[in-house]
């Protein structure tokens, strides 16, 4: 295959939450349209942007692909490539495939085994397909990533004791407050992470849950699910005074809670402590809030300690999962390599079929009128001959191509042997027929 798979990204290991916030791609439209102009050096792209990572999968020609992607990415965020490069990793070929399979299987997550990343990857793929940004290679790669993730979950226990970011947030709250039954929590946002947080809060014995969401109906639905109260988003600054624990996970582009807002809230609370956990990227809560007395603000990076304690339980299972990823990455690499062989197989079959059809036409001309049944029988016979004659050469070619590094040499030999780069069937293709006819005439 002339084109190569690239994966360019940053994540919670290479970049702080501040950096991830700066380069988050909450709307990937501009970038996808910028990276895939028709007929340019990049033909396919899928963009995954979550609170813990931004990763761009691209199929393109030449070593300049990563720089091109980085330029578009930085420009989409109003930054320069030089601002982005220190935090970025670039994977190519099978390394890109292996990394994506690890991401899909949640082996590269802050919380190994958490289920959210697979849904986020599927959503990213759906959006790319909707914008016609994928073709054969990424379509195959993403679907394979989904099946690898399913296999990892089925064949290993990597997810059995996994904690989600939402679980880690609630565990952190329990460490601060201890007994939760006397406290009231507010969830800002009503997505999957908020729903998970509500589940864990309820299990921890929280006294009451409030849900504030821009779309009131969705907030109301979540609140009812957990016997809580829905709050109008415009009343957020007023109702915050009732909450001891606030967990925020919206998709806002700018902070929705600022220090000046909390100063007023603290006065109404008579300076009773407030505990904020911001698990959104970009962040929902202005970091300056943490400078206020009686306010404790934690962001997604602060949850690592809780997560690390859970890691030891899953190390053995993660090792099994990585073996699966390695195996499947190797299988995908073979398929990718086979794309180089496919045109030769197609050309070989077409050549045989063209010769067969020419011979059929000559034979029918010599025979004169024949009925449809005879014509169909002759056609079926020729198709069978073409398949059987080509079966052994194609099987040999595939086997040698898979087994040996010099697979491209076999392609070259085959193309030259059968004259596959010539548009027309050579005149000597009919030489046997001519010699046979001369003997018949003698």
From Swiss-Prot:
Catalytic activity annotation: (S)-4-amino-5-oxopentanoate + tRNA(Glu) + NADP(+) = L-glutamyl-tRNA(Glu) + NADPH + H(+)
Binding site for NADP(+): 189-194
Something else known: During catalysis, the active site Cys acts as a nucleophile attacking the alpha-carbonyl group of tRNA-bound glutamate with the formation of a thioester intermediate between enzyme and glutamate, and the concomitant release of tRNA(Glu). The thioester intermediate is finally reduced by direct hydride transfer from NADPH, to form the product GSA.
Species lineage: Bacteria, Pseudomonadati, Thermodesulfobacteriota, Desulfovibrionia, Desulfovibrionales
Top-level EC class: oxidoreductase
Designated gene of the protein: hemA
Protein name as catalogued: Glutamyl-tRNA reductase
Record-linked Pfam families: GlutR_dimer, GlutR_N, Shikimate_DH
Record EC number: 1.2.1.70
Function: Catalyzes the NADPH-dependent reduction of glutamyl-tRNA(Glu) to glutamate 1-semialdehyde (GSA).
Family, similarity comment: Belongs to the glutamyl-tRNA reductase family.
CDD domains: NAD_bind_Glutamyl_tRNA_reduct
Annotated positions binding substrate: 50-53, 109, 114-116, 120
Annotated GO MF terms: glutamyl-tRNA reductase activity; NADP binding
Subunit note: Homodimer.
InterPro entries referenced in this protein's UniProt entry, alphabetically: 4pyrrol_synth_GluRdtase, 4pyrrol_synth_GluRdtase_dimer, 4pyrrol_synth_GluRdtase_N, GluRdtase_CS, GluRdtase_dimer_dom_sf, GluRdtase_N_sf, NAD(P)-bd_dom_sf, Shikm_DH/Glu-tRNA_Rdtase
């Amino acid at each position: 295959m002339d084109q190569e798979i690239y994966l360019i990204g940053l994540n919670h290991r290479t970049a702080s939450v501040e950096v991830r916030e700066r380069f988050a791609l909450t709307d990937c439209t501009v970038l996808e349209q910028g990276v895939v102009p028709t007929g340019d050096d990049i033909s396919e792209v899928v963009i995954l942007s979550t609170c813990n990572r931004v990763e761009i999968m691209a199929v393109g020609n030449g070593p300049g692909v990563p720089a091109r992607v980085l330029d578009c990415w930085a420009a989409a965020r109003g930054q320069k490539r030089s601002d982005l490069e220190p935090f970025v990793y670039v994977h190519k070929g099978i390394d890109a495939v292996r990394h994506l399979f690890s991401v899909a299987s949640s082996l590269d997550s802050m919380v190994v085994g958490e289920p959210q990343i697979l849904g986020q990857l599927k959503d990213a793929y759906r959006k790319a397909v909707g914008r016609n940004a994928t073709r054969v290679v990424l379509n195959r790669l993403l679907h394979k990533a989904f099946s690898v993730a399913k296999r990892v979950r089925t064949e290993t226990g990597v997810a059995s004791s996994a904690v989600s970011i939402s679980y880690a947030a609630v565990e952190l709250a329990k460490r601060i407050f201890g007994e939760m039954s006397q406290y009231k929590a507010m969830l800002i946002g009503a997505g999957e992470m908020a729903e998970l947080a509500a589940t864990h809060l309820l299990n921890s014995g929280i006294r009451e849950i409030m849900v504030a969401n821009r779309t009131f109906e969705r907030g109301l639905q979540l609140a009812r699910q957990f016997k809580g109260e829905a709050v109008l988003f415009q009343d957020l600054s007023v109702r915050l005074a009732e909450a001891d624990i606030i967990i925020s996970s919206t998709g806002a582009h700018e902070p929705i809670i600022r220090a000046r807002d909390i100063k007023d809230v603290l006065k109404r609370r008579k300076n009773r402590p407030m505990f904020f956990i911001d698990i959104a990227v970009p962040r929902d809560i202005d970091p300056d809030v943490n400078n206020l007395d009686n306010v404790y603000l934690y962001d997604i990076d602060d949850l690592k300690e809780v997560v690390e304690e859970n890691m030891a339980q899953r190390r053995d299972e993660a090792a099994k999962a990585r073996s699966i990823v390695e195996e499947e990455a190797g299988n995908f690499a073979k398929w990718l390599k086979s794309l180089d062989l496919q045109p030769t197989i197609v050309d070989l079959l077409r050549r045989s079929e063209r010769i067969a059809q020419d011979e059929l036409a000559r034979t029918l001309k010599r025979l004169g009128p024949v009925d449809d049944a005879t014509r169909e029988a002759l056609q079926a016979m020729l198709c069978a001959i073409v398949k059987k004659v080509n079966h052994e050469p194609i099987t040999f070619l595939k086997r040698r191509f898979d087994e040996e590094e010099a697979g491209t040499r076999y392609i070259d030999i085959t193309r030259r042997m059968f004259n596959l780069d010539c548009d027309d069937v050579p005149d000597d293709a009919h030489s046997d027929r001519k010699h046979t006819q001369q003997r018949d005439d003698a």
